[in-house]
Amino acid sequence: MLGVLLVLHGSKIPEWKDVGIKYAEYLSRYFNLVEFGFLEFNKPTLSEALSNLLAKGANKIVVVPLLFATGTHFKRDIPRLLGIDGDEKKIQYMGKEIEIIIADPLGFDEKIGEVLVKRVNETYNKNY
């Protein structure tokens, strides 16, 4: 069964968790097993979120970093926190081999650009 694991950076500000909750709820319309985890500061951690998916029966997991670009978190931290070693895309869980695929960072996307335009206009109109 496919599991989707959203990865958020995390913050000392508790409201960061609300973003994870909202994106997980949104993706739950399309996928049965969706969890989110944070790289630092907030709970659930990435490892805890992975454990939740595995406990619910996920045997293939697509990891979706909510990051804009490739960097240290993407290249080093996410694989390490998921227990992925090198180019290996599998982990062992209760005697089973679990495939983990990490999606690319968000990068540039015109739909995200449209959201940015909307935010600029909302902010400008609210203040002028």
Swiss-Prot record:
Stored CDD domains: CbiX_SirB_N
GO molecular function: cobalt ion binding; sirohydrochlorin cobaltochelatase activity
Residues binding substrate: K43, F68, A69, T70, G71, T72, H73
Pathway as given in its UniProt record: Cofactor biosynthesis; adenosylcobalamin biosynthesis; cob(II)yrinate a,c-diamide from sirohydrochlorin (anaerobic route): step 1/10
UniProt enzyme class: lyase
Cited Pfam families: CbiX (PF01903)
Gene that encodes it: cbiX
Origin superkingdom: Archaea
Residues where Co(2+) binds: H9, H73
Family (UniProt): Belongs to the CbiX family. CbiXS subfamily.
Record GO biological process: anaerobic cobalamin biosynthetic process
Listed name of the protein: Sirohydrochlorin cobaltochelatase
The reaction(s) this protein catalyses: Co-sirohydrochlorin + 2 H(+) = sirohydrochlorin + Co(2+)
Function of the protein: Catalyzes the insertion of Co(2+) into sirohydrochlorin as part of the anaerobic pathway to cobalamin biosynthesis.
